[in-house]
Amino acid sequence: DNSATRAALEMCSAASRPFAVLTKGGMRAADDFDIYEGNGWFGTTLAFTDDRSRQAWEPCAASVESRIEAIRTAHSLGIRTWVSMEPVIEPAQALDLVIELRHDVDEWRVGRWNHDARANSIDWTEFTSRAIRTCLDTGADFMLKEALHRYACPGAITRYVDGQVVARRTA
C-alpha cells in the first residue's frame, strides 16, 4: 500500500515544494508519476545489470528490469530522474548502467560498498577514476558520494552538473 507515500507527495506538490524519491520498488512507483510535474525527482538504486546478482543481494527489491523501466518511463514523462549507484559490488556492471541509461538519467550519485570486508577486494581508486571518466564521456551529471572522495585524485571532479564542474577534490 503506497497511500502514505502518495499523500506525502501530494502535500509537497500542492505546496509547490520540491521533492525527491528514492526507491527500489521499480514500476510500483509509477502509480505516483502524475504528482511529479515540475517539482519532483524520481530516483532508484541500481548497481547491477544482471538480475541474478540483484536477486542474491537485494531479494526483496524490484528487478533490475523493473527499476530501469521505471526510470525510462519517468524520464519519458518529463520527470527528472536520478540513480543512486550503490552499493557497488560489481564495478563493471555499475559502470555499464551509466552507458546503458545515459539518455534516461539526469543525475548519477555514485557511492561504494561499505560495511563488508569483501569490499576491500575492489580497487576503489580505479573504480572512482573510471566512474568519473564514464560519466564525463557520456555527458552525465554526477556526484561522487563522500565515501569515494578519498579515492579520487586531488583536483578530480566530484560533482558535475549541466556541463559545469561544480566541485573538485581538495588535497
What is the predicted function of each stretch?
Residues 1-135:
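Conserved AdoMet/S-adenosylmethionine-binding subsite of the radical SAM
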Residues 122-171:
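C-terminal accessory extensions appended to soluble enzyme cores
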